[in-house]
Amino acid sequence: MIPPEPGLDGDADAPAPGPPAPATAEGYQPDALPIARRLATSPLFFPLWFRGRLGPETRMPMVGWFDPAQLLSTGIKSLVSLAVGEQSDRRIVQALASRRQEYYDHAIHYRDGSRGPQPAKDAVRDELWLDFICDTGDGWNSTYAVAYAAAQRSLLVPLDGGPVALPRGDVLVFGGDEVYPTPSREEYQRRLVAPYTAAFGDDAPAERPHVYAVPGNHDWYDGLSAFTRLFCSDIGGRRFAGWWTRQRRSYFVLKLPHRWWLVGSDGQLQSDLDVPQMEHFREIAERYMQAGDRVILCLSMPVWVYAQKYRNMGRVFDETDLIYLREEVFAKRGVEVKVYLTGDLHHYRRHQETAESAAGEAPVQKITAGGGGAFLHPTHEEDVSVLQEEAVTDDARARAFEVKATYPDMKRSARLAFGNLRFLFKNPRFGVVPATIYLITAWLVGAAAGGEAPSNPWRALRVTVDAFSTHPGLALWCAGIVLGFLAFTDTHSRVYRVVGGLLHSVAHFSAMFYIGWGALDVATRWLHASGVLRAALAGVGTFIGGWIAGSVVMGIYLLVSVNVFGRHSEEAFSGLKVEDFKHFLRLHVDREGHLTIWPIKIERVPRRWRDRGEGDATTSRVVPDGTMPVELIEPPIHVA
């Protein structure tokens, strides 16, 4: 008989009688896990189970831009990216790593091979369809609605003469800000890759479409690392959902049929086209483009709008790089930029060159189409009905442009702004910020007043004024709050900053005073509390009141700012989280070489989705639970 082996405690560990233990993986001892980990799998101990874990298939909500944690995280990342972005420009590294000045030829057909797309035998294209989608990768409903529409083999859109079928784009171009709020591999997967994978589904076309992407400022917040891995790297295979990826840099040039070209530029964080990028475009123009060729130029932001908006406010944005690229790189070779496409502003707005400026030629189009999934931006906050370029070279003519279409229209945009009256309900977590400020202020005032409980508001006001005059720390705290409101005010005018910031401060301080005194009065006279209990009850009341009143004041401030002064458009509409009014562009180079742009809109995106059923005529894995009408924003735009 073989004796048992001695245990670690020196005693013999004889096997216990009974049935043998179930087989487990070698080295795995579940009984040795921490108690909380073992209990977490039991439904009786569900509080220990982390139910909020996000998987790659999670249907993400719209980004809560006014959530305190989100505000802090995004603010820090944007400041860091601005501080180090200029010194760690990944575009320079890309230029050094890929010295070939190459373009991607889509004037030919491709076939799918084991090593990616290869030119087909009967290669020459006589026409091409191209989709342009900007500002996507936000909430599931809005992002997937656009992805679903773009991924269908054909879209039927109504026209006066009857519905027209628009085939899916042979090429998909993302025009910037592919993910929100900040880039990471996880966010790209959840907010961009997963929706487009589900939308493309199990479709297996004979010739898969290709995808290219221009990075926006949100893609740059990590130095472009996640973007580069997804769109510019061989890691993980050259696939994005059902599309092939091919680009090696964050900027690219596509050759299209009939002497059309598409140029995708990378303006980093400040709409700055770096020298290697300019030289890349210049060399391709010199070697491959010919006089009479036409260019579609894609940018990450509408610099023509920002230049007009800030022209008299310090020239924060200008069109110098844009005009230099047009005049010095292309025009000197007889190549003309006919269309400018961009996003960044999450609405649709088309500017067309005026007849006087075009001088008998086909007018140039400048189109902002940022409706790929992100929250809606207003169209009524700024007068950009007429844009005037500034000539930056002696032989360049200054061109004028006028608005031809906006979506949503300006009146509807102004009406949507009234949603800020429900700011409290649309951004419930934001209330912790004013609630904390109100509570700390009331606490400091109460401590300075020696715990006195004034019986009327006039006495309370006098006690408060005395507290400020005799306690410098309290005065400095409140001065810091005022400075914060002044800094928050969205303006380049010192007068408006002071007036707007002070009025905003007065509104909050008034709410603080009445809520703080009211909570103390209720605790004293109604609840007959005293001492620590009174202070605790008054603190709870002040916190709750600050949560509600602070959010209401913020909503009113944003509404007045955007509808009266045309300021805070970003804040006023990001808090609304409008999922609707989504859109994208479908471009068509036809057999005769004419370019037509179809601006496609989804007025209301579905809120309910279901898995594809047997009777659904689509390859998408998820379909709307109901109808999703697709229409045109305006009649198709015939460029040339």
Regions found by a protein language model. Give the residues of each.
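Preference for well-ordered, secondary-structure-rich cores of eukaryotic proteins
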Residues: 232-239, 249-252, 265, 276, ...
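Acidic, histidine-bearing metal-coordination/catalytic regions of metal-dependent phosphoesterases
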Residues: 1-174, 179-215, 219-258, 292, ...
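Active-site neighborhood of phospho(di)ester-bond hydrolases with catalytic His/Asp-centered motifs
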Residues: 133-134, 170-177, 207-217, 265, ...
